[in-house]
Amino acid sequence: MTQEVLERSIQVGGRTMTFQTGKIGKQAGGAIFCRYGDTVVSAFATGSAQPREGIDFFPLTVEFEERLYAAGKIPGGFIKREGRPSEKAILSARLIDRPIRPLFPEGYRNDVQVVAQVMSVDQDCASDITGINAASAALTISNVPFEGPVAAVTVGLIGDEFIINPTVEQSEKSVMHLTVAGTKDAVMMVEAGAQEVPEAQMLEAIMFGHREIQRIAEFIENYRLEALERNLAKPKQEVVMKQMPEEIVQAVKAFAYDKMDQAVRTEEKKAREEAIRQVKEEALAHFAEQYPEDSKTIDKILEDFVHKIVRRLITVEHIRPDGRALDEIRPISVEVGILPRTHGTGLFTRGQTQVLTVATLGAVGDEQILDGLGLEESKRYMHHYNFPPYSVGETRPMRGPGRREIGHGALAERALLPVIPDENDFPYTIRLVSEVLESNGSSSMASVCGSTLSLMDAGVPVKSPVAGIAMGLISEENHIAILSDIQGMEDHDGDMDFKVAGTSQGVTALQMDIKIKGVSREILERALTQAKEGRLFILDKMLSVIEKPRPELSPFAPRIITASIHPDKIREVIGPGGKTIKKIIDETGVKIDIEDDGRVFISAVDGEAGENALKIIQALTQEVEVGRIYNGRVTRIMDFGAFVEVIPGVLGLSGKEGLVHISQLAHGRVEKVEDVVKLGDDILVKATGIDKQGRLNLSRKEALPNPNPSSNPNPNGITANRNPRNS
């Protein structure tokens, strides 16, 4: 049987991206085998035949499956198979979800599942970018009514040059890591981390990426047309939208629209929610007898009224639900140092959004080890975001962090990363935890502000303070409104959530999600400009409370002492089976981390304990210098000489000793060793050399003054200090 396969390629960033269909996954709605360099991602898109009943949302799920065989690895542990998705996989799934979600028909309620499976990894060709393009192509050739295609690229910036899909080496030099996704017509999604890049340059980078996206999107569209000709793509599913009965719509509108309009204008969130709830209850009770089977329909009509009223108020009347101007920021309250024994705290309140961020400083060994499909790395700065149900007045089971929490934590982490001090200047592991205590929108950006406050309160020498703001967009007919510091209702009923974080000098992080079919350059430019104004306002509020990092660390934070030893001496500090280093830790109560290059990090809450540990390590690794005179102690007497310890032992371990041959004890002839020295004597000796076996040779004779028979009654120098030396 002949197998029909369609394979086409396009050059992206100087490398070949190949799309293939017809060979694998033929029972899926659409299947694409995508190779970019040596990275291979297979994407499968499948939709259900019928809509899911009784829901008011689009049931789209996106899975990003990492297989360790893709990197030539076997999973650890007893089970030896992949478990829960990694944080990287969750963030990659979100990257795919966000640009494709707005491109399904409004009101479409069929289940759709997109699975991107990483099968081979080339570190220079990112699997998440490959996954977005593969998923878009799979949806485009499937029967799912997807209004794409979309495409995605990463943009780097080295000097003044933008680079599409930079390699690992280029990424290390780049001051920007920007992911852009979009259609041929508009930008759909932006995700960025940057080193204080100016807004104008960030905008140019987005548009530079979009020009490459247009080329890839057109390629995918042409690929679909060719696949259709060969029966390798499927006709799109016909979408039948459930229409609201016009009679009920008009009846509900006549009874409830004006009441709902007044309810929406209530400024305080909880009072507004209660007012809207009362209008709904009143309407449902009023129509219970007339339309007894249509309570869900009536509830949906009322929700649509809220949506339309919010949008009309903002775009036509320029009135926001809480009464603010379009560019006005909610009242801000800032506090630091509110927890007594933590290392640093920042409480940031903006309107009805409140976040407490706590900073904890740890030893080098507290770094997070990342061992996924990429190279094994460690992370010394991390941010974790928690969004409990009580923050929005709800109850639900509290389990582990969800995708949203992981995504928000990663965004806030990325925003502060450029201002975290270098390890050489501040050798601490830093963990931030943001607890959302109250939320009415923009909690991730409040976490950014809280992070800056907690770091400065902890005495971390951040390079610049960072603040964040969430911008919104409502586009209604010929009216466009860009909102600063959006709250929950504006996010829910708006068209864009554009989060911007940065310093006074430039942007450090961006994230844009939209619900419409894209945004133009003009809108992006206006949003970035307005966001900068808001960010500078917020920074002023923060700096009025804590202007710069505290000069001293918290008394409860560990003190880290750094030292450097020769790499060959590492084994002497560690000892057989780790015995020596365990003794040091038990004796002093410190934490010790040793890098392969010989850097030693001693972490101790008690500074004296850290100094004691350092002295022990210095004693263990101290080298005997040939030619130097030492005050040593006689440890053994032999017929042929005396063994002398020149560097004392520590922790019950032997020190460094060498042999003073009998011929080197004195200037004259010595018949018997005991005539010159006794066990336990402290004597001056000179290190004269180290033989091929690593044995140390010492000489007492060379440490003595030159003999002068006329003035020295004891030319053999047969004297010794019988007093025990200080050890």
UniProtKB/Swiss-Prot annotation:
Cross-referenced SMART domains: KH, S1
Q: What does this protein do?
A: Involved in mRNA degradation. Catalyzes the phosphorolysis of single-stranded polyribonucleotides processively in the 3'- to 5'-direction.
Which domain of life, per UniProt?
Bacteria
Compartments reported by the entry: Cytoplasm
Q: Name one GO molecular function term.
A: RNA binding
State the encoding gene.
pnp
The species is: Desulfitobacterium hafniense (strain Y51)
Q: Identify the main location.
A: cytoplasm
Look up the record and report any one GO term of the cellular component aspect: cytosol
Q: What is the lineage of its organism?
A: Bacteria, Bacillati, Bacillota, Clostridia, Eubacteriales
Q: What is this protein called?
A: Polyribonucleotide nucleotidyltransferase
Q: Which family does it belong to?
A: Belongs to the polyribonucleotide nucleotidyltransferase family.
